[in-house]
């Protein structure tokens, strides 16, 4: 178990072909993130020494990737997007493998009618990497359980945007190294337990009534007539309605699935830890390497007037290390509810 706040990082620059260009021996600072349904980033500041300086001078964006290890375990990798060389210092910024999808387009036209969103997402990813693969795998944990009607046209739109669109209607995804993980929004596997003692800076329990909806309507494109509805008047809350347009939805069935998915995320009222990023204690009983967006942690707190004991989804992780030590922060959000209808 590698405790939060006690890790030591190392960094390597790796060529697209797999060979190590150079280790970054003199790290001044390291920051890396993991994010649900989007591209994560990393940033390192290095003091070049000896031969390392010449090798760092050969770093090239997109050709080379940054690989970060924490206590000897690889925790992050992705292509270098920006590099800056100054006197006695080199700074590198990188993004995870999902950033490639923001530079790829659909390479053939296709129509999906009633396919699970994970199958559609898998097709988008494989199609994007088919002409030129930087090295990837796809891991489907479970089908999303949401059917999607989608249509993609060759050379129209960025694949990354198409994938984010699927995440708006019932799918979750994240990157772990060179693996893209696809999962349903209600994926609830837990990686640990957190209590009040694990939050040394305190926390805030919040109930977000602005997110509540008892009836959700999803429309397709204006001219399509496609519509899906989920829910109605609730015996406890009354009637709160939301109507949204999802132009990529092409069938009534997929619109209905999208409406149900959106209502599951908005009903009942979401209760969560309101801090955008909660700092963990070094004694927290969680393995930092296993803090992956999409997975969950069980949280129990009695420190406020609103006790909370529930499973929360990891929405993001931010790890920083510099001369003052390491900080590990997590973003925790409510799980989609089981509507039972």
Where are these regions (language model features)?
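Acidic, small/polar-enriched beta strand-loop surface segments
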Residues: 2-17, 188-324, 336-341
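A broad structural signal for short, well-ordered beta-strand segments within beta-sheet-rich domains
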Residues: 23-29, 80, 146-150, 198-202, ...
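Beta-strand-rich assembly/attachment modules of structural machines
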Residues: 1-119
